[in-house]
Amino acid sequence: MTDTNLDFLAQTDPTLAAMIQGELQRQREHLELIASENFTSPAVLAAQGSVLTNKYAEGLPKKRYYGGCEWVDQAEQLAIDRAKELFGAAHANVQPHSGAQANFAVFLALLNPGDTIMGMDLSHGGHLTHGSPVNVSGKWFKVSHYGVSPDTERLDYDSILELAKKEKPKLLICGYSAYPRIIEFDKFRAIADEVGAYLMADIAHIAGLVASGHHPNPLPYCDVVTTTTHKTLRGPRGGLIMTNNPELGKQFDKAVFPGTQGGPLEQVIAAKAVAFGEALKPEFKVYSGQVIANAQALANQLNQRGFKLVSGGTDNHLMLVDLRCIDMTGKEADKLVSEINITANKNTVPFDPESPFVTSGLRLGSPAMTTRGLGVEEFREIGNIIADCLLNRNDEAVKKDCLNRVKALCDRFPLYPHLNIPVPVLA
């Protein structure tokens, strides 16, 4: 998305242009703490708004079912090569439209309906596509779920091994949507080998940390690795499948197309190439380190203010605040922080007595605001703002003060200052 594109949009569809401008203003004026969100570079936005959106390109580079693919072949191959270099993978498929699509392709390649899969329970930090009963993965396969220890709120690898011996899964899944600690992929490899299972790592949340060396890389241990390309990787919304096994790579390629998708989104693949290129630069390693430092600063500040953190803190980009310590639900906390222009999300905590629509937790993450330039001191201030807001839930004066402090931070660290749509925002 460039100024020129926005000008065209404002001229041809001012109604939609106003909506996009409204969303731009919302992003500028809020502290974005949703752990799965980030702000892409202008270059990523530009690639997604390019003429590549016009091209159909079923198949793989140099193996297409349509003519005229010489340039999209080069763009897609660039994305593949950069993904392989970034993660140290022998094979990469950059076509999945999303992380869920990447996971489904792996399931199609490795499993038959009725096979057993084993992943983390959603309420403990897993993901819908890892066997939740409301997801197709929970309908097509027999599912066994593991969770965290009730004592440490961390993975208990001995318990996972015992469950795997009992259930004998064909596919063991590690990688999560709300787990704040380091994942020991070597221990999962040993468990998978013990029971003869394939091992899949879904690193959608931690991909940027893995790519930059701030989290162990699963590729030496896992048969297949899937991820999204946004979140900590700071690219466009999309998916990616990687493996070091050439034969499995061929199966995954077929499972993506024609197995689960038709034509790839070449404009998004080009944006993935941009993001992978950015992540290969030294600046990205610095950024990822700051993401972790900022998350730990926020977690420590909340802990000092009396809040309980699931597992006691964080090793990565996210944390879970257990709000039962202040007799508050996640739904209530989500609403309160939204009123002071902080965007977060309610989230279940391990062994949560509340429903998923209410929850006892609040999930917070540092990637987006780290992209805007905030550092440790600013994240400590964010911790104090959140604490002041939640601990004084009925005090309007405190709420107003918190809102002003949020505004001050947003003003100090502007977002996309070059972008603007010359149309009024809709009421």
Curated annotation (Swiss-Prot):
Name of the protein: Serine hydroxymethyltransferase
Pfam families noted in UniProt: SHMT (PF00464)
UniProt binding sites for (6S)-5,6,7,8-tetrahydrofolate: L122, G126, H127, L128, E247, S355, P356, F357
N6-(pyridoxal phosphate)lysine carried by residues: K231
Protein task: Catalyzes the reversible interconversion of serine and glycine with tetrahydrofolate (THF) serving as the one-carbon carrier. This reaction serves as the major source of one-carbon groups required for the biosynthesis of purines, thymidylate, methionine, and other important biomolecules. Also exhibits THF-independent aldolase activity toward beta-hydroxyamino acids, producing glycine and aldehydes, via a retro-aldol mechanism.
Catalytic class of the enzyme: transferase
Sequence intervals crossing the membrane: none
EC id: 2.1.2.1
GO molecular function, one term: glycine hydroxymethyltransferase activity
Compartments it resides in: Cytoplasm
Entry-linked PANTHER family: SERINE HYDROXYMETHYLTRANSFERASE (PTHR11680), SERINE HYDROXYMETHYLTRANSFERASE 1 (PTHR11680:SF35)
Residues carrying the site annotation Plays an important role in substrate specificity: H230
Predominant localisation class: cytoplasm
Keyword Ion transport: no
Gene, per the UniProt record: glyA
Needed co-factor(s): pyridoxal 5'-phosphate
Species name: Crocosphaera subtropica (strain ATCC 51142 / BH68)
